Amino acid sequence: MMTLASLPSTAIAGLASAAPKVQPRMAANDEFAYGLPGGANILGEFDPAGFLKGKDKLEVYRLREAETTHGRVAMLASLGFVVQEKFHPLFSGDNGPAIEQIPQLPYWLWIVMTIGIGRAELFRIQKGWAKVNPETGKADSALREGYEPGDLGFDPLGLAPSDPDEFRLMQEKELSHGRLAMIAAAGFLAQEAVSGDTWGTYWGDATF
């Protein structure tokens, strides 16, 4: 079945995390990951691959922006894998792994997806990324000063708590769920690639 992994990341970003109504806590430069949420775990300062080694604050924030975006997409993708085993009105869902069904999409849907993803990514760039450098004529690959990674200013349901500690806890929860979802989505894809069939078929006729 088709998964939701192909959806534009920014189209769903606001659904996964509310925009802050409070001023984010300012961290000292000597804090792990410059004090960003997501480091509170039993392993402590966990960075075995050394991604943060020697990185300045804007670069660390850029990595967090990428992690948050991928986590949000993965949460929808994981949910999509489960839901679409039983509910797939647009696609049959019965002809092999999801990754093999991508070429089966009609051309008009590719056009719609391309335009939608392009507009969504343009919005995200305008919201958080540095402007074009007038000296080089190229866009800087860093976030704007003062931009909080993942904060696209979208909170239609008013979910963001007013208390700074509660808001940080919400950020911690989103990151934890996003990280788990990335592992889950990768597991779904790997399982389908190995078994050659859809996720639900691998476990038998889904009745949930």
From Swiss-Prot:
What protein is this chain from?
Fucoxanthin-chlorophyll a-c binding protein, chloroplastic
- InterPro entries according to UniProt: Chloro_AB-bd_pln, Chloroa_b-bind
Gene Ontology MF term list: chlorophyll binding
Alphabetical keyword list: Chlorophyll, Chloroplast, Chromophore, Light-harvesting polypeptide, Membrane, Photosynthesis, Photosystem II, Plastid, Thylakoid, Transit peptide, Transmembrane, Transmembrane helix
Q: What induces it?
A: Expression is increased 5-fold under conditions of low light.
- Where do transmembrane segments lie in this chain? 102-118
The listed locations are: Plastid, Chloroplast thylakoid membrane
